[in-house]
C-alpha cells in the first residue's frame, strides 16, 4: 500500500515541462530570501521604535504598493514580455532591500516600503504568464501546484533563517535577502533564454490582436470571479493575521507552539497537494473544486467553536484550512489561465494578483475590527457566513459560465516551442 502511494506521489511530478521546474527553482530561491517581510513589523517596532499604529500604517503602504505593482506588472508583461519583467523585478527588488536598511524615518519608510512592494509584486503577473506559456493544458494545474510548493517551502524556510540572521544583527537580514533576490535573477538568466521569451508580435500585430480580444476590465464574468476570489482570500488570510493572535491570547500558547502548529499547513500542502491535484484534475469543473474548498474553510473556523479542546480544534483548523487551500488556489488559478491568452494575458494575471493584494489589505482590517467590537467567536461565525456567500457566488458563476472560457487567442509560444538557454 505504501509502495502504491509512493508511486502515485512520484507519478504526479512526471510530464511537467522542464521550464516549469526551472521557474519553480527560481521562485524557491526568491521565496527562501523573503525574510525581511516576515520580520518587518518586529523590525519597525523593536529596532526603529515605531509604535504599533505607525507600523500598521507602514503595512498599509505595503499593501497599496502590492496593488499598484500587480496592475503595472500585468500591463508591462503584455507590453515587454514576461522575461525582462521578471528579471528586472528581481534585480531592483534586491537593490531596494539593500537601500531599505538605510531608511529610519517614518514617512521615508512608508515610501520605501511602497516602492519595495510595488517592485516585488510586478514579478507575479509575469511569472504567472510564464507558467501559463510553458505548461500544456494537461499539466497546467499540476504546474501551478508545483509552483505553489516552492512558495510554501520558501515561506517555511525564510522565517527560520530570518530569525537566525536577525539574532546576528538586522543588517544581515537585509543583505542576505537582497543578494538572494539578485541571485534569483542571475539564476533566471542562466537557466532560461531571454531571446526565446521575447514577444513574437510586432506593434502592428499587437494592436490588431488587442482590438480582437477582450480586456479583463470589461470581462464582466471575470470581474465577478475576481471579486469572489478577493472574498475567499479575506477568509483564508485570517490564518496569517488573526488566528495566531487568537492562539496567543485565547489559548495562551507560546510562540514556539504557535509556529509548530502553523508549520503543519505548509507541510500538508507540500506533501499532499501535487498527488491530490494529479488525481482530481480534469474530472470536474474547476469552480466545483473551489466551492468544496470554501466548505472546508467554513469547517476550519467552526472548529474553534466546537467543544473538543484547544489542541484538537487547532489541528482540525489547520487540516481543514490546508485542504481548503489545496482545492481553492490551484483550481482558481487554472480557471484564470484557461480564460486568458495572447496579448492580454498579463492583464488577466495582474487583475488576479490584485484580488489577493486587496484581500491582504482588507483581511487584517476586517479581522481585527470584528475582534475589537464583538470578540473572536463573532469573527469565526462571520467568516463562516462570508465563505457561504462566496460559495453561492461561485455557484452562480459556474452555472452561468460552465466552460469558463472567453478569450480564445492562442498564446505567443507553446511549452515545447521555447528552448532553454545553453
What do these predicted regions represent?
Residues 1-17, 193-227, 416-422:
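Juxtamembrane intracellular "pre-TM" segments in multi-pass secondary transporters
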Residues 13-63, 223-228, 232-261:
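Helix-loop boundary and gating motifs at the non-cytosolic
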Residues 35, 63-71, 155-156, 266-274, ...:
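Residue-level signature of mid-helix packing/kink "hotspots" within the transmembrane helices
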Residues 69-81, 272-285:
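Helix-to-loop junctions at the C-terminal end of transmembrane segments
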Residues 84-98, 288-302:
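Structural signature of the two symmetry-related core transmembrane helices
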Residues 101-113, 305-317:
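Helix-loop junctions at membrane interfaces in 12-TM secondary transporters
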Residues 114-151:
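Cytoplasmic helix-loop-helix junction between adjacent transmembrane helices
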Residues 174-189, 380-395:
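Symmetry-related core transmembrane helices of the 12-TM Major Facilitator Superfamily/SLC fold
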Amino acid at each position: 500500500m505504501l509502495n502504491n502511494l509512493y508511486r502515485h506521489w512520484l507519478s504526479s511530478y512526471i510530464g511537467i515541462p522542464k521550464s516549469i521546474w526551472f521557474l519553480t527553482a527560481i521562485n524557491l530561491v526568491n521565496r527562501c530570501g523573503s525574510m525581511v517581510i516576515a520580520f518587518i513589523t518586529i523590525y519597525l517596532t523593536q529596532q526603529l521604535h515605531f509604535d504599533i499604529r505607525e507600523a500598521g500604517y507602514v503595512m498599509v503602504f505595503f499593501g497599496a504598493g502590492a496593488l499598484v505593482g500587480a496592475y503595472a506588472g500585468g500591463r508591462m508583461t503584455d507590453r515587454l514580455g514576461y522575461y525582462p519583467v521578471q528579471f528586472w523585478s528581481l534585480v531592483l527588488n534586491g537593490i531596494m532591500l539593500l537601500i531599505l536598511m538605510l531608511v529610519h524615518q517614518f514617512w521615508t519608510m512608508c515610501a520605501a516600503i511602497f516602492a519595495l512592494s510595488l517592485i516585488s509584486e510586478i514579478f507575479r503577473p509575469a511569472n504567472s504568464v510564464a507558467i501559463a506559456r510553458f505548461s500544456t493544458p494537461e499539466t497546467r494545474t499540476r504546474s501551478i501546484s508545483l509552483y505553489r510548493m516552492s512558495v510554501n517551502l520558501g515561506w517555511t524556510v525564510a522565517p527560520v533563517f530570518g530569525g537566525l540572521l536577525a539574532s546576528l544583527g538586522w543588517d544581515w537580514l537585509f543583505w542576505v535577502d537582497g543578494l538572494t533576490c539578485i541571485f534569483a535573477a542571475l539564476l533566471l538568466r542562466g537557466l532560461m533564454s531571454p531571446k526565446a521569451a521575447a514577444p513574437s508580435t510586432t506593434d502592428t500585430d499587437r494592436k490588431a490582436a488587442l482590438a480582437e480580444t477582450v480586456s479583463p476590465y470589461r470581462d464582466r464574468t471575470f470581474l465577478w470571479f475576481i471579486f469572489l476570489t478577493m472574498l475567499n482570500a479575506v477568509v483564508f488570510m485570517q490564518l496569517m493575521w488573526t488566528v495566531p493572535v487568537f492562539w496567543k491570547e485565547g489559548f495562551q500558547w507560546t510562540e514556539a507552539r504557535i509556529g509548530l502548529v502553523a508549520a503543519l499547513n505548509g507541510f500538508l500542502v507540500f506533501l499532499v497537494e501535487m498527488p491530490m491535484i494529479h488525481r482530481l484534475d480534469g474530472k470536474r469543473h474547476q469552480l466545483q473544486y473551489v466551492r468544496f474548498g470554501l466548505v472546508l474553510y467554513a469547517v476550519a473556523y467552526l472548529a474553534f467553536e466546537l467543544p473538543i479542546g484547544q489542541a484538537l480544534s487547532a489541528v482540525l483548523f489547520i487540516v481543514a484550512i490546508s485542504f481548503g487551500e489545496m482545492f481553492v488556489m490551484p483550481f482558481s488559478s487554472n480557471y484564470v489561465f484557461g480564460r486568458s491568452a495572447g496579448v492580454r494575458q498579463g492583464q488577466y494575471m495582474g487583475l488576479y494578483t490584485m484580488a489577493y493584494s486587496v484581500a491582504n489589505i482588507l483581511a487584517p482590517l476586517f479581522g481585527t475590527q470584528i475582534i475589537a467590537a464583538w470578540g473572536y467567536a463573532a469573527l469565526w461565525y462571520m467568516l463562516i457566513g462570508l465563505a457561504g456567500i462566496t460559495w453561492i457566488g461561485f455557484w452562480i458563476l459556474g452555472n452561468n459560465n460552465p466552460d469558463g472560457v472567453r478569450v480564445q487567442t492562442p498564446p505567443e509560444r507553446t511549452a515545447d516551442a521555447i528552448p532553454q538557454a545553453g
